[in-house]
C-alpha cells in the first residue's frame, strides 16, 4: 500500500491514454491522481506513480530528461538541440575496494588493522559521517594508501573519483572528474521534494544532496539537476566561493537557503558535525528563499569577509 489505508482489491485505479500523447491516472479508492502532457515536465505526482508501479529511478530520470528535451526543442527550434550528457566509465586507483567490505581488516596487514585504513575511518567519523553513508573506498596499495576515495557514479557506473589526503600532505585532493558531472545525482530518488545543491562531495553526502564540484554551475550540470523536476535549493558555503555559487542559483532561477548558523559554521558539513543531521536539514528547509530580491538582500549579510 503506497497511498491510502488499504490496498484496492476492486481495480478502481484507471489509466487513460489519449491520442495527443496525454496520460492520466485516477485511483477511485484513495483519490490519487497524476497526469503527463507532452511538452510539459513530468510532475512530482507522476514520478511518484511511476515509482509505485515499479519503474526504476534511473528510468524515471531518463524519462524526465526526455521530457525536458521536448520542452527545450519546442520552445525555440533555432537553438542548439539538447543533448543528454554522457560520461565515460573510469577505473578507480589500483586495489580500491569499499570500506564496508573490509570486514577482515586483520588480513590486510600481518600486524593487524592498517593505520591508513584506520585513519580513513577516523576521518569520516570526525566529519560526522558513518562508513555506510556512502560507498567510500580505500586501497592498501601505492600513494593512494593514505587517502579516502570517494567514487563518482552516474547511472550506476563509476565515472570518476576524488581521493582526500588523510592527515598532512599535499595535494589535499586528487580528483578525476569529467566536464558537466554532478556528484550524487544517482541517489536523488523520485519521491523527494527538494534537491539540495552544494559545492563539495562531503557536504553533499552530509545532507544527501548533489555537488557541482566547483563554485560555477555549468549549463550541462544545470540541465541534469533540472531534470529531477523538483525544487532546486542551493546551500552555499559562507565564503567567496559560496557567494559565486549563489550567483549561479540566481542565473538558473533556483532557490537558496540561508540557515542561521553560529559564526563558526562555514558550510553544511560543519553544521552536521555541530548540530547533527536532522537539525541541520530542518534549518535548511526552514530557511529556503525563492524571491530573487530577498535572496540578494540576505546574501549581503550571510557571507563571511
Predicted feature locations:
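Short Gly/Pro-enriched loop/turn and capping motifs at secondary-structure junctions
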Residues: 239-241, 263
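Phosphate-handling DNA/RNA-contact segment within nucleic-acid enzymes
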Residues: 122, 126, 141-231, 236, ...
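Short, surface-exposed amphipathic charged segments that create phosphate/polyanion-binding patches used
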Residues: 226-229, 266-281
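Short, aromatic/basic amphipathic alpha-helical patches
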Residues: 243-253
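A generic structural motif
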Residues: 255-267
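TOPRIM metal-binding catalytic domain and adjacent DNA-binding surface shared by DnaG-type primases
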Residues: 1-6, 44-149, 153-155, 190, ...
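N-terminal single-stranded DNA-binding subdomain of primase/primase-helicase replication proteins
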Residues: 1-49, 139-144, 260
Amino acid at each position: 500500500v503506497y497511498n491510502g489505508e488499504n490496498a484496492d482489491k476492486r481495480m478502481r485505479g484507471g489509466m487513460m491514454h489519449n491520442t495527443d500523447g496525454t496520460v492520466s491516472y485516477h485511483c477511485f479508492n484513495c483519490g490519487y491522481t497524476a497526469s503527463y502532457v507532452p511538452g510539459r515536465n513530468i510532475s512530482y505526482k507522476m514520478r511518484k506513480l511511476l515509482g509505485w508501479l515499479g519503474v526504476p529511478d534511473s528510468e524515471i530520470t531518463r524519462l524526465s530528461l526526455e521530457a525536458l528535451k521536448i520542452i527545450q526543442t519546442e520552445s525555440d527550434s533555432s537553438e542548439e538541440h539538447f543533448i543528454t550528457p554522457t560520461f565515460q566509465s573510469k577505473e578507480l586507483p589500483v586495489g580500491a575496494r569499499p570500506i564496508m567490505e573490509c570486514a577482515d581488516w586483520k588480513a590486510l596487514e600481518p600486524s593487524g588493522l592498517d593505520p591508513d585504513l584506520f585513519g580513513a575511518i577516523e576521518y569520516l567519523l570526525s566529519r560526522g559521517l558513518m562508513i555506510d553513508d556512502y560507498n567510500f573506498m580505500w586501497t592498501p596499495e601505492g600513494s593512494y594508501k593514505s587517502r579516502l576515495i570517494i567514487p563518482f557514479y552516474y547511472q550506476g557506473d563509476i565515472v570518476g573519483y576524488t581521493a582526500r589526503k588523510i592527515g598532512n600532505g599535499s595535494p589535499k585532493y586528487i580528483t578525476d572528474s569529467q566536464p558537466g558531472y554532478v556528484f550524487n545525482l544517482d541517489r536523488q530518488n523520485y519521491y523527494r521534494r527538494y534537491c539540495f545543491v552544494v559545492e563539495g562531495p562531503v557536504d553533499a553526502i552530509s545532507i544527501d544532496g548533489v555537488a557541482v564540484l566547483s563554485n560555477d554551475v555549468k549549463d550541462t550540470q544545470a540541465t541534469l539537476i533540472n531534470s529531477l523536476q523538483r525544487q532546486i535549493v542551493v546551500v552555499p558555503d559562507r565564503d567567496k566561493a559560496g557567494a559565486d555559487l549563489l550567483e549561479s542559483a540566481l542565473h538558473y532561477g533556483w532557490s537558496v537557503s540561508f540557515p542561521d548558523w553560529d559564526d563558526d559554521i562555514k558550510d553544511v558539513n560543519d553544521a552536521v558535525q555541530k548540530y547533527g543531521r536532522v537539525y541541520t536539514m530542518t534549518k535548511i528547509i526552514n530557511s529556503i528563499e525563492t524571491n530573487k530580491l530577498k535572496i540578494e538582500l540576505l546574501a549581503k549579510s550571510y557571507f563571511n569577509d
